[in-house]
């Protein structure tokens, strides 16, 4: 059985959260997700991931158990870049099931050669713990631009 979350349902839920958020940062998190869901071609999954293909690939799609090689850029809701393999001029490689759930889910939707934008609510990112010694604050909604370069079976 396939479950599709409609744009309206996602936008309504996120707007409700934004309307009653006390902290301005919490409102920015919800605003980011709502804006991402409105982008042309965006798909909102049941987990809350907002996936948008920027460039379709033509190679293999990875399984969660595969090792992937990617280039990526990660930003906070305010646009602050917190990490970039592009800046290091070095792609990174990792087992797909060894990263945040947002990446595991989102990268499996890609094909080698493709590029996508993932908007990750905190629940499928770093949650209340945050990461990077405070670089990624607790309960942060994150955006990633990911380019899938290669897939290797584990």
Predicted regions: what they are:
Residues 2-154:
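Cross-family detector of peptidyl-prolyl cis-trans isomerase
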């Amino acid at each position: 059985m396939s479950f599709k979350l409609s744009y309206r349902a996602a936008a309504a839920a996120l707007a409700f959260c934004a309307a009653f958020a006390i902290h301005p940062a919490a409102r920015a998190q919800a605003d980011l997700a709502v804006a991402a869901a409105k982008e042309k071609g965006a798909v909102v999954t049941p987990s809350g991931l907002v996936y948008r293909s920027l460039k379709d690939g033509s190679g293999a799609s990875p399984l969660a158990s595969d090792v992937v090689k990617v280039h990526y850029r990660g930003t906070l809701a305010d646009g602050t870049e917190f990490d970039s393999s592009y800046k290091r001029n070095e792609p990174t490689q990792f087992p797909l099931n060894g990263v945040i759930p947002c990446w595991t889910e989102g990268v499996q939707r890609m094909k080698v050669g493709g590029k996508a934008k993932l908007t990750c609510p905190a629940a499928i990112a770093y949650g209340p713990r945050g990461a990077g010694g405070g670089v990624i604050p607790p309960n942060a909604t994150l955006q990633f631009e990911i380019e899938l370069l290669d897939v290797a079976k584990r």
